[in-house]
Amino acid sequence: MMNVKKYQKQYYMPPVPCMDWAKKDSIEKAPVWCSVDLRDGNQALVIPMSLEQKVEFFKLLVEVGFKEIEVGFPAASETEYEFLRTLIEQDLIPEDVTVQVLTQAREHIIRKTFKALKGCKNAIVHVYNSTSYAQRQQVFKKSKEDILKIAVEGAKLLKELTEEAGEKYRFEYSPESFTGTEPEYALEVCNAVLDVWQPTADRKAIINLPSTVELSMPHVYASQVEYMSKNLKYRDNVVLSLHPHNDRGCGVSDAEMGILAGADRIEGTLFGNGERTGNVDIITVGMNMYMQGVDPELDFSDMPKLCHAFESFTGMSINPRSPYCGSLVFAAFSGSHQDAIAKGMHWIEEKAPDTWTVPYLPIDPTDIGRNYDADVIRINSQSGKGGVGYILETKYGLNLPAKMREAMSYTAKSVSDHLHKELRPDEIFELFKDTFENVTTPYNINGVHFKQLDAGKIEAQVTSNYEGGEYTTVFAEGNGRLNAVSNALKQQYNLQYDLVSYTEHALEQSSSAQAIAYVGIKKPDGILSWGAGVDPDIIRASIDALVTAINNR
């Protein structure tokens, strides 16, 4: 039995209600994004990235469009230090990109950090110390006053060393474990730091509010953020930043609600990599904006490339259900879902609307480098006629009649169920050909000749055999060529059925194109049987379709 009494709430509500953010229903503008993949993400890996891998990852982040990138904790290890030096000395930092470095509010660590920054043009120095009740009590064993003093002294040293270096580095402060800190106290510490830095319009300070450990529901975090946003000093000259983690699975919601509550900036990682359950996934937050018509100002147009690079650099695997980027996120196996998607895609093609509204697909997969054939309609034992028909039509140009699509879907489902596997598009096409196209056993036609009679009648001379036996020739009349051939076969083999469906179309747009015909016949018991015929001669194609339908009875 689990001991629920072992736990209690560890967060603190603001001293006054802060719920103005809840009046907003969406994000209207992208925040400033800061990638922490190379620091927070890297330190969470079983095997941290090598210097070479980090350089390549940095280039990838620049390509995606990040303008602020936390590149590490230079005082933590030689690899971290050398990575920053490599970026600076090899001139790998674009002029419009600012690198961010992390340091504890400890003098020797801050000094080593500045040593690592020598020669860097654009940098954010990010200093932090933990302010939560639990850490004050258990880790540091210090009072609120002592913790505030650590923050202020760290802020002073950052300012002093920046002036000595003759640089205009920007400053960032994080009350680490903000979510476990009393909001009034977090505000006091942050305002004391801001008093040291005296931010201006052309040199804003960053106050970062990390949910170092996610402790509450997202609306609580948003209320804490709103309280800070409303009460920070120098607010017009402060960039309010968030650093959500995902311990309760709500990192994305924390970020989104936090933006509504006044945050200007989000720190996170690609695919949510990071300590424990990870940092907030910037891709999800950004794509959530995109699917509502808000430009995330990051380029995710080649998601497969991003996925491959991330897995290569980190050794991590992306969950197939991870929003927007997982291998199965657009996949529809359910028959009803496939049918709705197929109809939605046809509607989009016919109407060409300005906005995307296809059922079950929140965005157009092609916008992020995915494709319909491999990523959307997937066929297994749960699939239906819509999915099978869509694949055969869009990939192979086969426009099956509705009832024939249904018959083909039953065939595909049966095979998938028997084999316990998903069927690829090429397997579905081969299954269609094996089952419904030009089937010549047990009945087979060897030759047909036609003669025009009076009153529009057609006489067919049909040579055929059954189960490889001797060929026999019979004559029969009909209202058309196909009807005459059908009557000949009925006469020869005493067959009973009604010809109830016939359609045809070209498979290619050229004078020598193959044509395909679809024939449906109804047996006395009311069951439909289907066949397709493919031939440059549409008459021959229709005869082959009829014979196949008879053979499929």
Where do the PLM segments sit?
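Short beta-alpha connecting loops at secondary-structure transitions
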Residues: 135, 209-211, 239, 267-275, ...
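Positively charged, aromatic-enriched nucleic acid-contacting surfaces
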Residues: 460-464, 507-530
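Mixed-charge, glycine-accented linear interaction segment located at domain edges/termini
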Residues: 527-530, 534-553
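A mid-to-C-terminal "edge-of-domain" accessory segment
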Residues: 2-39, 293-475, 511-514
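Short, small-residue-enriched loops and turns at beta-alpha junctions
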Residues: 40, 44-45, 74-78, 132-134, ...
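Catalytic alpha/beta core domains of metabolic enzymes, predominantly
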Residues: 216-349
